[in-house]
Amino acid sequence: MQRHMLKSKIHRAAVTHCELHYEGSCAIDEDLLEAANLVENERIDIWNINNGERFSTYAIKGERGSGMISLNGSAARRAQLGDLVIIAAFAMVDEAELQAGWKPKLVFIDEGNKIKGHRDHVPTQNWT
């Protein structure tokens, strides 16, 4: 059996550009792509923390070190500059890979879209 698992996540990225008339996609700083194990043309889901919008597109490379998160084409209508988004990708993982310790790449960034930390799991949520 295979399971559809979280593979990559960039958490709380600030939208830096919205380019309505650019070919559709999401340009992501190449440093963030690599840290999250995302590749160019990979399908990504984007969840807008500010307005609740959830949509899919594909990743393209943004200038390395720029902090760029550019929503392009129709995706530009789903956010405003400065909105915080979560960018995620999923993968089909078989039971053997899971048993061998397969883990996602979770990237946490600061206000300037620079990497401030990594994790390989989401902590248990508590009621405290």
From Swiss-Prot:
Pathway: Cofactor biosynthesis; (R)-pantothenate biosynthesis; beta-alanine from L-aspartate: step 1/1. One of its GO terms (biological process) is pantothenate biosynthetic process. It comes from the Bacteria. Keywords: Autocatalytic cleavage, Cytoplasm, Decarboxylase, Lyase, Pantothenate biosynthesis, Pyruvate, Schiff base, Zymogen. It is found in: Cytoplasm. This is Aspartate 1-decarboxylase. It catalyses: L-aspartate + H(+) = beta-alanine + CO2. The modification Pyruvic acid (Ser) is found at S25. Its main location: cytoplasm. Substrate binds at T57, G73, S74, A75. PANTHER family: ASPARTATE 1-DECARBOXYLASE. Catalyzes the pyruvoyl-dependent decarboxylation of aspartate to produce beta-alanine. Belongs to the PanD family. The active site is at S25, Y58. Heterooctamer of four alpha and four beta subunits. Binds 1 pyruvoyl group covalently per subunit. Its cofactor is pyruvate. Is synthesized initially as an inactive proenzyme, which is activated by self-cleavage at a specific serine bond to produce a beta-subunit with a hydroxyl group at its C-terminus and an alpha-subunit with a pyruvoyl group at its N-terminus. GO terms for cellular component: cytosol. Its EC number is 4.1.1.11. GO terms for molecular function: aspartate 1-decarboxylase activity.
